[in-house]
Swiss-Prot record:
Main EC class the enzyme belongs to: isomerase
Keyword set includes Isomerase: yes
Keyword rRNA processing applies: no
Any GO BP: D-ribose metabolic process
EC number from the UniProt entry: 5.3.1.6
Domain of life according to the entry: Bacteria
Entry's Gene Ontology cellular component terms: cytosol
Quaternary data: Homodimer.
UniProt similarity note: Belongs to the ribose 5-phosphate isomerase family.
Catalysed reactions listed for this entry: aldehydo-D-ribose 5-phosphate = D-ribulose 5-phosphate
Protein name per the record: Ribose-5-phosphate isomerase A
Length: 223
């Protein structure tokens, strides 16, 4: 199977998992990126089965609306049963690196609200130790140099992501050459740097369920 076929398979598996648990008042949290887009496309076939969605980015909101799925502001939603999103890396404990698409802050907020966080990914994203994929950090622009110096002290090699502004108007620094053996601790350390909005480690609030696309089919991992 190609990578696109694996993404479509896990997207469909996520729809199959949540659909029996949805009703006409349900609102679904939706992530950002190519795998999340596959999920949106699969979910759209069942848009009569739920009320609408909360989007983690402007791009996701536009895709949902294009399918005729109502999009709600998170502040107007009191309960979010599911959040479905992809990942750049996952370990076996379902700690994630996310943010390759620069939507990490809004993704992390929606994930924090959701009762169940379902991560969907192809098998290449499952790794023994996080960090081969550069760790994105969203930063207030005036703090870029300060944050970069602090990231060096933590052992990383920070690289400014040229030409990218987040939906929140901030910049991204990608931290290379990190072997992340304690993701919960590192997430807190980076978030404590003045000028950091958040970083792409999802370890304090990891995924609850990982649907992993492999050549043998979709595998389900839980914490």
């Amino acid at each position: 199977m190609t990578q696109d076929q694996l993404k479509q398979a896990v997207a469909q598996a996520a729809v199959d998992f949540i659909l029996p648990k949805l009703d006409d008042k349900s609102i679904v949290g939706v992530g950002t990126g190519s795998t999340a887009n596959c999920f949106i496309d699969a979910l759209a076939k069942h848009k009569a089965a739920f009320d609408g969605a909360v989007a983690s980015s402007q791009a996701t909101a536009a895709r949902l609306k294009a399918h005729g799925i109502p999009v709600y502001e998170l502040n107007t939603v009191s309960d979010l049963e599911f959040y479905v999103d992809g990942a750049d890396e996952s370990d076996e404990h379902l700690n994630l690196i996310k943010g390759g698409g620069a939507a990490l802050t809004r993704e992390k907020i929606v994930a924090a609200v959701a009762n169940t966080f379902i991560c969907i990914a192809d098998g290449s994203k499952l790794v023994p130790v996080l960090g081969a994929f550069p760790l994105p950090v969203e930063v207030i622009p005036m703090a870029r140099s300060h944050v970069a110096r602090q990231l060096v002290k933590l052992g990383g090699d920070p690289v400014y992501r040229e030409g990218v502004l987040t939906d929140n108007g901030n910049i991204i620094i990608d931290v290379h050459n990190m072997s992340i053996t304690n993701p919960v601790e590192l997430e807190a350390q980076i978030n404590a740097i003045v000028g950091v909005v958040t970083n792409g480690l999802f370890a304090a609030r990891p995924a609850d369920l990982l649907l992993l696309g492999t050549a043998e089919g979709v595998k389900t991992l839980t914490r």
